[in-house]
């Protein structure tokens, strides 16, 4: 029986370091190749030795697919391709291909140049890795090889994020990456057609959360920022360079404009310009409103938001700063946090998910004394707020996607075990499909029962509907025809068309049944009696007595011969074609009942 095997090397009952191996119909595909933000040693990368202990990985993988540019989905890519060794194709969308190297280089600078870490990829490795990337368009079917094909669907979440369908023959898997089922201020909602994959691999970051209305959250966010600024405090909003950052910038920009506020808003240097550039370049990936108004006004050119200089952090008075990265695990956001943490007037607003091990996760868990580098203790007096502006699907969104795609099986990744368990039960109850949640390194085997698509010729369809009643949508309809297999595809055509295409002559298959009749008369007299009997009974049929002494009823032939041993018995040979099976059987049973007694 065909099977699909799935092994998470990262994001199995965990968030961070997304990397999932899928084996489908003899093809091996790696989905994402991320880095874990909670570790500073080798554990930050997935364990690629699972694929092979020695030798390059190219021999074991048919392709790699990257869903979007966040580092927990693409951060290990240069390490994987250049240090471990992979030369095969890497697929991602055009915006992901453009933005991915910028974020990788940013992170490399923080890790290597500032922290001095070794066993990390170089700038050249990032460039060499990106040369192996093949960029894909949405809804474009890409043929990886003769049998393996992939297709990208819009995922919302961040600019360029995509869900991917992987198909080999009749078997298919859909991998969601990270997605958002509700549109926001700059991106549309994720969408997929009713593709009915054998397996849907979905993220489950917010497996147990159903978010309140977006408007309430936005109002709450603006109120907290406004109150802090009014009392002279500073607000730090840790974000990743692209995505949620633009969402919140648009929100604050319009609020500052409306309220005529004067407190400065800053954004990490350099990244705003880059973000603007890419949002202009890939405007088709944003939502309808931004696309419509883009010619008159670029939503991403902010009047109130200025580039940040690190010296500004020490300026007196209120300010709002968007700084990267979003989990307070390194970089500018962490530096500013250390400076402002000791003042209760200040506030840090965490707008998204933080993985375990990061400073963001620690303060959200209520820790107020943090051990920083060099065993230095940092006391957190500033207010800590968590406001979910996450671009991930919540429980309702995940259920909605399952309803849209109609998969035969579901597998959960990118979430916490307890929350996954709850969602798993909910999915199984509501959709009556198997749901799996493997841990890292654990292989799940899913047996598939692939359906084989068959094209039906128009002529055959017309003929079937002409002779039958209107089809009932709820009941399967039987189709009679000839199945032709050619170039790995199946077609159902009429027998006449099949004969014509294949250059064959039709052979008639006839069935013959012997019926014994007690009649001492001569054979030609018996035939005449049979003819008169059938003529009287079968008034709606053409019954003929032929010169050679045989009888026809439509295409059915009846002949009479004497019994070899009993002169008083005649043998009737009733012969019919397969098409006249019903009439042939009826005639046979009629004759077996015998002939009516003659009056002569």
Swiss-Prot record:
Residue ranges annotated as motif HXHXDH motif: 68-73
Class of the enzyme per the UniProt entry, highest EC level: hydrolase
GO terms under cellular component: cytoplasm; INTAC complex; integrator complex; nucleus
SUPFAM superfamilies referenced in this protein's UniProt entry, alphabetically: Metallo-hydrolase/oxidoreductase
Top-rank taxon: Eukaryota
EC numbers for this chain: 3.1.27.-
Names of the cofactor(s): Zn(2+)
Catalytic site: 203
InterPro entries associated with the record: Beta_Casp, INTS11-like_MBL-fold, IntS11_C, MBL, Metallo-B-lactamas, RibonucZ/Hydroxyglut_hydro, RMMBL
One annotated GO biological process: snRNA 3'-end processing
Binding locations of Zn(2+) 1: 68, 70, 157, 178
Alphabetized UniProt keyword annotations: Cytoplasm, Hydrolase, Metal-binding, Nucleus, Zinc
CDD domains per the UniProt record, alphabetical: INTS11-like_MBL-fold
Gene Ontology terms, MF aspect: RNA endonuclease activity
Compartments where located: Nucleus; Cytoplasm
Residue ranges of the motif Nuclear localization signal: 469-479
Binding site for Zn(2+) 2: 72-73, 178, 414
Family: Belongs to the metallo-beta-lactamase superfamily. RNA-metabolizing metallo-beta-lactamase-like family. INTS11 subfamily.
Subunit structure: Component of the Integrator complex, composed of core subunits INTS1, INTS2, INTS3, INTS4, INTS5, INTS6, INTS7, INTS8, INTS9/RC74, INTS10, INTS11/CPSF3L, INTS12, INTS13, INTS14 and INTS15. The core complex associates with protein phosphatase 2A subunits PPP2CA and PPP2R1A, to form the Integrator-PP2A (INTAC) complex. INTS11 is part of the RNA endonuclease subcomplex, composed of INTS4, INTS9, INTS11 and inositol hexakisphosphate (InsP6).
Protein role: RNA endonuclease component of the integrator complex, a multiprotein complex that terminates RNA polymerase II (Pol II) transcription in the promoter-proximal region of genes.
Protein known as: Integrator complex subunit 11
Originating organism: Gallus gallus
């Amino acid at each position: 029986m065909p099977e699909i095997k799935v092994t998470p090397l990262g994001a199995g009952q965990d968030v961070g370091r997304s990397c999932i191996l899928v084996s489908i119909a003899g093809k091996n595909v790696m989905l994402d190749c991320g880095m874990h933000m909670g570790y500073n040693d080798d554990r930050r990368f997935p364990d690629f030795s699972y694929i092979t202990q020695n030798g390059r990985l190219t021999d074991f993988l048919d392709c790699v697919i990257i869903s979007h540019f966040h580092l927990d989905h693409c951060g290990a890519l240069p390490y994987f391709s250049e240090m471990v060794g992979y030369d095969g194709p890497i697929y991602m969308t055009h915006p992901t291909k453009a933005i991915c190297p910028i974020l990788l280089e940013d992170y490399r600078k923080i890790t290597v140049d500032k922290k001095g870490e070794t066993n990390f990829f170089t700038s050249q490795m990032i460039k060499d890795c990106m040369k192996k990337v093949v960029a894909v368009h949405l809804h474009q079917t890409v043929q990886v090889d003769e049998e393996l094909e992939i297709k990208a669907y819009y995922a919302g979440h961040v600019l360029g994020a995509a869900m991917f369908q992987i198909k080999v023959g009749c078997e298919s898997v859909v991998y969601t990456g990270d997605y958002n089922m509700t549109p926001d201020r700059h991106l549309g909602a994720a969408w997929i057609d009713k593709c009915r994959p054998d397996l849907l691999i979905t993220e489950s970051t917010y497996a147990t959360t159903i978010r309140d209305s977006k408007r309430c959250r936005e109002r709450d966010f603006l109120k907290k920022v406004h109150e802090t600024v009014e009392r002279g405090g500073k607000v730090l909003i840790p974000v990743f360079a692209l995505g949620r950052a633009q969402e919140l910038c648009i929100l604050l920009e319009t609020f500052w404009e409306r309220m005529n506020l004067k407190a400065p808003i800053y954004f990490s240097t350099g990244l705003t310009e880059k973000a603007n550039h890419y949002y202009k370049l890939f405007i088709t990936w944003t939502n309808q409103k931004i696309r419509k108004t883009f010619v008159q006004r670029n939503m991403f050119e902010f009047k109130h938001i200025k580039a940040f200089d690190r010296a500004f952090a020490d300026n007196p008075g209120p300010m709002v700063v968007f700084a990267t990265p979003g989990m307070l695990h390194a970089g500018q956001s962490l530096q500013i946090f250390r400076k402002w943490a000791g003042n209760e007037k200040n506030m840090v607003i965490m707008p998204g998910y933080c993985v375990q091990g990061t400073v963001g996760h620690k303060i959200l868990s209520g820790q107020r004394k943090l051990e920083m580098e060099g065993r230095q203790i940092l006391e957190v007096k500033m207010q800590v707020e968590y406001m979910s502006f996450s671009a991930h699907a919540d429980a309702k969104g995940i259920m909605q996607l399952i309803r849209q795609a109609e998969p035969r099986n579901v597998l959960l990744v990118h979430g916490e075990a307890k929350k996954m368990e709850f969602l798993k039960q909910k999915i199984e109850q509501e959709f009556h499909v198997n749901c799996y949640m493997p841990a890292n390194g654990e292989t799940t085997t899913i047996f598939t029962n692939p359906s084989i698509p068959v094209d039906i010729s128009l002529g055959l369809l017309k003929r079937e509907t002409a002779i039958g009643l209107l089809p009932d949508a709820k009941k399967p309809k039987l189709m009679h025809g000839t199945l032709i297999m050619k170039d790995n595809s199946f077609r159902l055509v009429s027998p006449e068309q099949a004969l014509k295409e294949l250059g064959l002559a039709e052979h008639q298959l006839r069935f013959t049944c012997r019926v014994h009749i007690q009649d001492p008369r001569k054979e030609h007299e018996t035939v005449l009696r049979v003819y008169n009997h059938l003529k009287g009974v079968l008034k709606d049929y053409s019954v003929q007595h032929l010169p050679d002494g045989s009888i026809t009823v439509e295409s059915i032939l009846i002949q009479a011969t004497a019994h070899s041993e009993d002169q008083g018995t005649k043998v009737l040979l009733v012969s019919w074609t397969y098409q006249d099976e019903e009439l042939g059987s009826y005639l046979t049973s009629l004759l077996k009942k015998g002939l009516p007694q003659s009056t002569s």
